[in-house]
A protein has these predicted regions:
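Active-site histidine-anchored catalytic micro-motif
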Residues: 1-162
Length: 164
Protein backbone atom coordinates (compact mmCIF):
# COMPACT_ATOMS: atom_id res chain seq x y z
CA UNK A 1 0.00 0.00 0.00
CA UNK A 2 1.21 3.50 -0.85
CA UNK A 3 2.16 5.96 1.87
CA UNK A 4 0.78 9.50 1.56
CA UNK A 5 1.69 12.60 3.57
CA UNK A 6 -1.19 14.98 4.37
CA UNK A 7 -0.03 18.53 5.11
CA UNK A 8 -2.74 20.84 6.44
CA UNK A 9 -2.30 24.59 5.99
CA UNK A 10 -5.79 25.88 6.82
CA UNK A 11 -8.50 27.12 4.50
CA UNK A 12 -12.26 26.75 4.33
CA UNK A 13 -12.00 22.98 4.05
CA UNK A 14 -10.77 22.71 7.66
CA UNK A 15 -12.82 25.57 9.11
CA UNK A 16 -16.05 25.89 11.03
CA UNK A 17 -18.43 28.83 11.28
CA UNK A 18 -18.27 31.24 14.21
CA UNK A 19 -19.91 34.56 15.05
CA UNK A 20 -16.97 36.27 13.32
CA UNK A 21 -16.93 34.11 10.18
CA UNK A 22 -14.92 30.97 9.53
CA UNK A 23 -12.23 29.95 12.01
CA UNK A 24 -9.84 26.98 12.11
CA UNK A 25 -11.89 23.99 13.13
CA UNK A 26 -10.46 20.61 12.18
CA UNK A 27 -7.09 18.90 12.15
CA UNK A 28 -6.29 16.56 9.27
CA UNK A 29 -6.72 13.59 11.64
CA UNK A 30 -10.24 14.77 12.48
CA UNK A 31 -11.04 15.23 8.79
CA UNK A 32 -9.70 11.74 8.09
CA UNK A 33 -12.22 10.40 10.61
CA UNK A 34 -14.98 12.27 8.72
CA UNK A 35 -13.94 10.66 5.40
CA UNK A 36 -12.70 7.23 6.54
CA UNK A 37 -12.62 5.72 3.04
CA UNK A 38 -9.52 7.84 2.31
CA UNK A 39 -7.59 5.11 4.13
CA UNK A 40 -8.48 2.78 1.22
CA UNK A 41 -6.13 4.75 -1.05
CA UNK A 42 -3.01 4.59 1.10
CA UNK A 43 -1.52 4.69 4.55
CA UNK A 44 -1.90 8.37 5.53
CA UNK A 45 0.24 10.36 7.95
CA UNK A 46 -1.13 13.77 8.95
CA UNK A 47 0.80 16.95 9.72
CA UNK A 48 -0.94 20.15 10.80
CA UNK A 49 1.80 22.56 9.67
CA UNK A 50 -0.08 25.89 9.78
CA UNK A 51 -3.58 27.33 10.13
CA UNK A 52 -3.73 30.34 7.83
CA UNK A 53 -6.38 32.04 5.78
CA UNK A 54 -4.81 31.58 2.37
CA UNK A 55 -5.27 35.28 1.56
CA UNK A 56 -2.53 35.88 4.15
CA UNK A 57 0.02 33.43 2.69
CA UNK A 58 3.40 34.95 1.90
CA UNK A 59 6.41 33.65 -0.08
CA UNK A 60 8.04 32.44 3.13
CA UNK A 61 4.97 30.23 3.72
CA UNK A 62 5.48 28.61 0.31
CA UNK A 63 9.12 28.05 1.22
CA UNK A 64 8.01 26.47 4.49
CA UNK A 65 5.60 24.11 2.70
CA UNK A 66 8.22 23.18 0.08
CA UNK A 67 10.77 22.62 2.85
CA UNK A 68 8.40 20.30 4.67
CA UNK A 69 7.91 18.26 1.49
CA UNK A 70 11.66 18.13 0.87
CA UNK A 71 12.29 17.03 4.47
CA UNK A 72 9.76 14.17 4.23
CA UNK A 73 10.19 13.42 0.52
CA UNK A 74 11.89 10.01 0.79
CA UNK A 75 9.34 8.71 3.32
CA UNK A 76 6.25 9.09 1.12
CA UNK A 77 4.88 8.14 -2.30
CA UNK A 78 2.82 11.32 -2.62
CA UNK A 79 1.65 14.44 -0.83
CA UNK A 80 -1.75 16.08 -0.26
CA UNK A 81 -1.89 19.69 0.95
CA UNK A 82 -5.22 21.03 2.20
CA UNK A 83 -5.34 24.75 1.52
CA UNK A 84 -7.60 27.77 1.12
CA UNK A 85 -8.87 28.45 -2.39
CA UNK A 86 -7.95 32.14 -2.58
CA UNK A 87 -4.25 31.48 -3.21
CA UNK A 88 -4.30 27.76 -4.02
CA UNK A 89 -3.16 28.52 -7.56
CA UNK A 90 -0.21 30.61 -6.32
CA UNK A 91 0.90 27.83 -3.98
CA UNK A 92 0.71 25.32 -6.84
CA UNK A 93 2.83 27.55 -9.04
CA UNK A 94 5.37 28.20 -6.27
CA UNK A 95 5.69 24.49 -5.47
CA UNK A 96 6.05 23.65 -9.16
CA UNK A 97 9.17 25.81 -9.34
CA UNK A 98 10.53 25.15 -5.83
CA UNK A 99 10.38 21.35 -5.90
CA UNK A 100 13.13 20.58 -8.38
CA UNK A 101 13.34 17.06 -9.84
CA UNK A 102 9.93 16.16 -8.46
CA UNK A 103 9.15 12.50 -9.19
CA UNK A 104 5.97 12.11 -7.13
CA UNK A 105 2.49 13.63 -7.07
CA UNK A 106 1.92 16.71 -4.91
CA UNK A 107 -1.78 17.58 -4.78
CA UNK A 108 -3.02 20.91 -3.41
CA UNK A 109 -6.71 20.81 -2.53
CA UNK A 110 -9.28 23.34 -1.43
CA UNK A 111 -13.04 23.54 -1.06
CA UNK A 112 -15.65 26.25 -1.18
CA UNK A 113 -17.57 24.73 1.75
CA UNK A 114 -16.35 23.43 5.11
CA UNK A 115 -16.00 19.70 5.50
CA UNK A 116 -18.98 19.51 7.87
CA UNK A 117 -21.45 21.41 5.68
CA UNK A 118 -24.25 19.60 3.89
CA UNK A 119 -23.49 19.08 0.18
CA UNK A 120 -19.86 20.06 0.75
CA UNK A 121 -17.37 19.70 -2.07
CA UNK A 122 -14.65 18.93 0.50
CA UNK A 123 -15.23 15.17 0.73
CA UNK A 124 -15.34 14.70 -3.03
CA UNK A 125 -12.22 16.82 -3.44
CA UNK A 126 -10.38 14.86 -0.73
CA UNK A 127 -11.20 11.59 -2.50
CA UNK A 128 -9.96 12.98 -5.81
CA UNK A 129 -6.79 14.32 -4.16
CA UNK A 130 -5.89 11.04 -2.46
CA UNK A 131 -6.62 9.07 -5.62
CA UNK A 132 -4.24 11.36 -7.52
CA UNK A 133 -1.60 11.33 -4.76
CA UNK A 134 -1.58 7.53 -4.75
CA UNK A 135 -1.28 7.35 -8.55
CA UNK A 136 1.85 7.15 -10.69
CA UNK A 137 1.38 10.74 -11.93
CA UNK A 138 4.26 13.15 -11.41
CA UNK A 139 4.00 16.86 -10.69
CA UNK A 140 2.00 19.43 -8.78
CA UNK A 141 -1.77 19.20 -9.19
CA UNK A 142 -4.75 21.22 -7.98
CA UNK A 143 -8.08 19.72 -6.92
CA UNK A 144 -11.07 21.96 -6.35
CA UNK A 145 -14.66 21.87 -7.50
CA UNK A 146 -14.33 18.24 -8.51
CA UNK A 147 -11.59 18.98 -11.04
CA UNK A 148 -8.01 17.75 -11.11
CA UNK A 149 -5.69 19.94 -13.15
CA UNK A 150 -2.00 20.58 -13.46
CA UNK A 151 -1.23 23.03 -10.69
CA UNK A 152 0.81 25.36 -12.85
CA UNK A 153 -2.33 26.17 -14.86
CA UNK A 154 -4.77 26.57 -11.95
CA UNK A 155 -6.51 29.89 -11.41
CA UNK A 156 -9.50 30.95 -9.38
CA UNK A 157 -12.17 32.41 -11.62
CA UNK A 158 -14.99 33.15 -9.19
CA UNK A 159 -15.05 33.77 -5.46
CA UNK A 160 -18.40 32.11 -4.78
CA UNK A 161 -18.71 29.24 -7.25
CA UNK A 162 -17.53 25.75 -6.42
CA UNK A 163 -14.72 25.40 -8.95
CA UNK A 164 -11.34 26.79 -9.93
Amino acid sequence: MKKICWLATGGTIASRPSENGLVPGFTPKEMLEMVPNLKDYAHIDCYDIMQLDSTNLQPEDWQYIAGYIEKLYEQYDGFVITHGTDTLNWTCCALHYMLENLAKPVVVIGSQLTIEEENTDAKFNLNAAFAMASSEKIGVFAVCGGQIIEGLWAKKLYLSLIHI
